[in-house]
Amino acid sequence: MADNDNEDVIMDDLVEEYVETEEENFVDSEEESEDKSEDKDEIVESPSICEGFVQASSQTLVIIPDNERITSNVLTTFEATRLVAVRAQQLAINGSTMLKKKYSSPIDIAKQELFNRKIPLLVMRCIKVTPEGQKIVEIWNPREMGIPLLD
């Protein structure tokens, strides 16, 4: 995991979905708003920043070791699309490409980086949030995962 410290991380809550209702969005002037950022997907720059982010939201990040992972080693279509979107956004603001061949658009470059297994991003899958406030996650490198076909 030490060689991936400079790579971006995408958090994806696969197990627990968060559904907001109008009542949950309403905040009375006397009440304080609860921090709901723990249940939403977040994009952060590196795992170390991610740890700071999760600790700032009163949670501790627990990373499952690679040999004890419980989720599938195949990217979901959502994860693959999100990886391409995040990478295309980076490339659109003058990010450097990992490919030698020239492509016309950031989306094409991001797709080729994903399919060539050169995309410099990580996928963080939230497994569970314990009552004690610990967030149990798996960090996957897309280079070691199966990739679905994208149009």
From Swiss-Prot:
Pfam families, sorted: RNA_pol_Rpb6
Ranges annotated as biased composition (Acidic residues): 20-44
Database matches in InterPro entries: DNA-dir_RNA_polK_14-18kDa_CS, Pol_omega/Rpo6/RPB6, RPB6/omega-like_sf, Rpo6/Rpb6
Main localization category: host cell
SUPFAM superfamilies: RPB6/omega subunit-like (SSF63562)
Subcellular location: Host cytoplasm; Virion
Presence of keyword Coiled coil: no
GO CC terms in record: DNA-directed RNA polymerase complex; host cell cytoplasm; virion component
Keywords, ordered alphabetically: DNA-directed RNA polymerase, Host cytoplasm, Transcription, Virion
GO biological process per UniProt: transcription by RNA polymerase I; transcription by RNA polymerase II; tRNA transcription by RNA polymerase III
SMART domains, per the entry: RNA_pol_Rpb6
Molecular function per GO: DNA binding; DNA-directed RNA polymerase activity
Region (Disordered): 20-46
Keyword S-adenosyl-L-methionine part of the UniProt annotation: no
Its job: Component of the DNA-directed RNA polymerase (RNAP) that catalyzes the transcription in the cytoplasm of viral DNA into RNA using the four ribonucleoside triphosphates as substrates.
PANTHER family in UniProt: DNA-DIRECTED RNA POLYMERASE SUBUNIT K, RNA POLYMERASE SUBUNIT, PUTATIVE-RELATED
Family that this chain belongs to: Belongs to the archaeal RpoK/eukaryotic RPB6 RNA polymerase subunit family.
Quaternary context: Part of the viral DNA-directed RNA polymerase that consists of 8 polII-like subunits (RPB1, RPB2, RPB3, RPB5, RPB6, RPB7, RPB9, RPB10), a capping enzyme and a termination factor.
Name of the protein: DNA-directed RNA polymerase RPB6 homolog
Organism whose genome encodes this protein: African swine fever virus (isolate Tick/Malawi/Lil 20-1/1983)
